[in-house]
């Protein structure tokens, strides 16, 4: 651009200044656009000759100041340094591209692999917006790595003659990581290791790592389970000082302690748990008060009697947040001395509890309720199967008590659903393992009345404790809130609900509800309709994904899924830290103590919610690993399944018998060239016109089982399709969709 000298430029008037502001705002609103002089003059209200002259002068000043540059003849754009800049966290995909999560921005910023500047997953980066799409979303270029993530990577070492490369398990690390063989001479080929990124110099093909830990040879069950824990930065042992602190706890129950508690040792009390349970943190007692009136005690292990606030053990429990349940093991929140011994409500032993006691009639009216510390004696340990047998036959130990509890529990359950609770009955996958941890079979744990019996009384205790702690009556009779730890669940967003509505429409189901309890009512109706159908699992899974996530907070919004205005977690303090927090709050408020520090509670709630999510991800990873390990023995075999998902590159199929899911790449399907018709959400064969969509029954062959990536590849067999091809002479009707890159 030919510059004008400053002395020949006219003075800036108010009108000129306004036009300059409009022009600058245009550049900033559309940072990737190239604007002509004519366009800018017209857009700023200066289509006349005089207006174009003023626009040219403004562009001259912006050019001199380094804000815009001439990129073609009389075409202008923002200079790189004046493009919108953001700082955020890099979220890497399997392809090597990155999405940058920026606080306060609705959408992530997409960064193509060629513009990532060696950034890695979890890095804090500076990104400049170089393009803005029609949907308003930015595409960016990473200009600086503000801070490298210290998150470790787990992978398999490939040892060469002069170097070691670690192939990471995580799909978020698509590059191999270099280790110095000279620095780490003992690392073996095929060994599972934990590494951190130390450096990634510009121009280098691979990041340089530092060895954190050697886990053992890949494929060994203990190694692989420890690898999952390491991937999610979860501990698998306690430090010696914590074990020593646990061993030092005095477990004796003195006469003085018993005298300070309500004594339930003469009241029939028992536990009901899974057959493989080692810690028993809840028990039920039942006593007939008079005809049609029962006293039900919900007795919870008094963990906070043994674990003092801010002690070594308490600090570790805060750090862990929750117990973690992998397929073949439990990683406890508390040391075994507490979780399996002192706090566990074992049969034929006296135990200390924190209890919620209710006097109920057959109409479920709560005639009395009492909260406080107790001492109990567990008369019997039932498994769920044993309690279920009593329910079904009417015979067995404590049959009258169990039948009474079950009758009341089923009535509570009916009342809950009548009030708008959602019936999410999901199957829980289990594995039959040999002594080495190898999966021999897959089965599903069914929720029966014995499970529901325990669940309903735990829900009753949780909601009543939440309301008692969260509110109090003033001297003038007003109800006021006080700081409390809640387990809350919001109603689904309109956007997620609309996606769910469109999803189930493909199966012929219509969902009209848009807000309030009508959503829950219609969901329950839908679940009843799809029971036993091919689409049941796909629809139920999508329904769960459409819901908001439950979390811990001090700001009560109620629990939408359970239809409770007040709800908390009180009943599992051995395995959840928020329950320990609630026990301490209950003790405080029973003693008329002053209100707790809400800000401190909120910080602990936030951390507990984070730890819960991480634990759930690790649990799912262990299930996926065992599913792939199980199917590795069935390579080449054929199975029946149903289509559970579609993408432009493949078909997800869930096997009917085991509910194991894998993907069949479209390119792997022999006999035709298949394309994804996004508009109609189906796959169509170009030659045959065969169509495949969600819920279709298919036959597959197991092609590959990648244990390291926990990934299954299937091959859909065309002769196993149960959807007919078009009649002869009827050509395939292929709707060509705009194929998008996998972002």
List the predicted regions and their residue ranges.
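Charge-lined substrate channels and their catalytic hotspots, especially those that engage the 3′ end
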Residues: 1-297, 304-350, 382, 681-684, ...
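Acidic, low-complexity intrinsically disordered tails
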Residues: 1-17, 673-682, 717-743
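Electropositive polyanion-binding surfaces
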Residues: 42, 194, 199-201, 217, ...
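A general secondary-structure junction signal
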Residues: 72, 80, 433-435, 488-490, ...
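A short macromolecule-binding patch
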Residues: 107-112, 173-179, 659-676
């Amino acid at each position: 651009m030919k510059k004008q000298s400053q002395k020949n430029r006219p003075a800036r008037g108010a009108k000129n200044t306004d036009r300059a502001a409009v022009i600058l705002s245009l550049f900033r609103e559309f940072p990737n656009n190239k604007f002509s002089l004519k366009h800018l003059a017209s857009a700023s209200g200066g289509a006349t000759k005089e207006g174009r002259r003023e626009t040219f002068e403004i562009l001259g000043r912006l050019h001199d100041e380094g804000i815009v540059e001439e990129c073609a003849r009389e075409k202008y754009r923002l200079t790189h340094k004046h493009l919108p800049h953001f700082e955020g966290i890099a979220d890497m995909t399997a392809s090597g591209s990155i999405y940058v999560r920026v606080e306060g921005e609705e959408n992530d910023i997409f960064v193509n692999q060629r513009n990532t500047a060696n950034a890695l997953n979890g890095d804090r980066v500076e990104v400049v917006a170089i393009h803005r799409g029609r949907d308003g979303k930015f595409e960016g270029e990473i200009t600086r790595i503000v801070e490298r993530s210290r998150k470790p990577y787990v992978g398999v070492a490939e040892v060469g003659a002069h170097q070691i490369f670690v192939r990471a398990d995580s799909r978020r690390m698509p590059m191999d990581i270099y280790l110095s063989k000279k620095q780490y001479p003992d690392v073996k080929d095929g060994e599972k290791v934990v590494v951190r990124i130390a450096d990634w110099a510009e121009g280098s093909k691979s990041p340089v790592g530092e060895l954190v830990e050697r886990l053992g040879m890949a494929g060994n069950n203990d190694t692989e389970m420890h690898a999952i824990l390491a991937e999610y930065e979860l501990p698998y042992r306690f430090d010696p000082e914590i074990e020593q602190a646990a061993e030092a706890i005095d477990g004796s129950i003195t006469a003085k302690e018993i005298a300070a508690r309500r004594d339930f040792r003469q009241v029939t009390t028992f536990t009901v748990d899974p057959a493989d349970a080692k810690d028993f943190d809840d028990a039920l007692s039942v006593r007939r008060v008079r005809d049609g009136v029962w006293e039900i005690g919900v007795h919870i292990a008094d963990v906070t009697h043994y674990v003092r606030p801010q002690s070594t053990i308490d600090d570790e429990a805060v750090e862990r947040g929750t117990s973690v349940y992998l397929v073949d093991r439990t990683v406890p929140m508390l040391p075994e001395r507490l979780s399996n011994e002192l706090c566990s409500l074992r049969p034929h032993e006296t135990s200390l509890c924190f209890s919620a006691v209710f006097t109920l009639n057959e109409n479920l009216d709560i005639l009395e309720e009492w909260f406080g510390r107790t001492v109990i004696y567990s008369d019997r340990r039932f498994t769920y199967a044993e309690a279920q047998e009593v329910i079904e036959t009417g015979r067995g130990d404590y049959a009258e008590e169990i039948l009474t509890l079950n009758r009341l529990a089923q009535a509570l359950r009916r009342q809950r659903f009548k009030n708008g609770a959602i019936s999410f009955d999901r199957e829980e996958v289990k594995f039959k393992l040999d002594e080495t941890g190898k999966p021999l079979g897959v089965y599903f744990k069914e929720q029966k009345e014995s499970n529901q019996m325990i669940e309903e009384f735990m829900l009753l205790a949780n909601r009543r404790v939440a309301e008692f702690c969260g509110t109090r009556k003033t001297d003038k009779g007003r109800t006021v809130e006080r700081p409390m730890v809640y387990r809350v669940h919001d109603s689904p967003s309109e956007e997620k609900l609309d996606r769910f509505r469109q999803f189930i429409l493909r199966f012929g189901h219509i969902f009209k509800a848009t807000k309030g309890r009508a959503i829950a009512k219609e969901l329950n109706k839908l679940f009843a309709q799809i029971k036993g159908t091919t689409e049941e699992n796909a629809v139920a899974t999508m329904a769960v994904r459409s819901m908001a996530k439950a979390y811990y907070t001090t700001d009560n919004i109620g629990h939408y899924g359970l239809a409770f205005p007040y709800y908390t977690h009180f009943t599992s303090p051995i395995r959840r830290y928020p329950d320990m927090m609630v026990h301490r709050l209950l003790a405080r408020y029973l003693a008329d103590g002053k209100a707790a520090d809400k800000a401190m509670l909120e910080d602990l709630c936030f951390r507990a919610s984070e730890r819960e999510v991480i634990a759930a991800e690790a649990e799912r990873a262990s299930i996926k690993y065992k599913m792939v390990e199980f199917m590795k023995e069935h390579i080449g075999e054929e199975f029946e399944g149903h289509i559970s998902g579609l993408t432009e590159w493949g078909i997800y199929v869930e096997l009917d018998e085991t509910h194991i899911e894998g993907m069949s790449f479209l390119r792997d399907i022999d006999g035709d060239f298949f394309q994804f018709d996004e508009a109609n959400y189906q796959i169509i064969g170009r030659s045959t016109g065969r169509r495949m969509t969600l819920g279709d029954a298919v036959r597959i062959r197991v092609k590959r089982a990648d244990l390291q990536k926990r990934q299954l590849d299937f091959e859909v067999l065309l002769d196993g399709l149960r959807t007919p091809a078009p009649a002869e002479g009827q050509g395939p009707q292929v709707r060509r969709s705009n194929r998008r890159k996998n972002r």
